[in-house]
Amino acid sequence: MHELSTMIRLVSLAQETAEKEGAKKVTALTVKVGEMTGILPSYLYKYFPEASRGTLLEGAELTCTGVPVRVRCLSCGTEYEPDRIPGRVCPNCGKTAAHILAGRDVTLENIEIES
């Protein structure tokens, strides 16, 4: 159910941005969803009509794109997309300690507006 609260926050952020730009309507928005977030894009699509009802985003086209997990090995600096998390192993040195670079955020990437 956290997809609904996430969608409400994204709609609110897009609404604020559109209002600052003097928009009359938001026609499309793009959301990036990291694989580690636990957010299912199918539920974002499901909840978008309800979350956007009565806002500038009502009737807009939603696009969700996945962001794969990307890490940097803390031992050798190699950047890679692990096969699994946890349990990732650097393909270069075999160590498991890594810094996550991408894949753990939900981001409002773009909105298209009508002025």
Where are these regions (language model features)?
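Short Cys/His-rich "knuckle" micro-motifs
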Residues: 83-86, 100-104
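Structured, basic alpha/beta domains of bacterial-type, RNA-associated proteins
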Residues: 66-70
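Long, charged N-terminal interaction/targeting segments
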Residues: 1-63
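Cys/His-enriched microdomains
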Residues: 71, 88, 106
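Cys/His-rich microdomains that often coordinate metals
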Residues: 79-80, 97
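Short cysteine-rich clusters marking metal-coordination/redox-active sites
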Residues: 73-76, 90-93
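Short aromatic-glycine motifs in intrinsically disordered, low-complexity regions
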Residues: 17-21, 92-100
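Long, charge-rich boundary regions
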Residues: 2-4, 30, 106-115
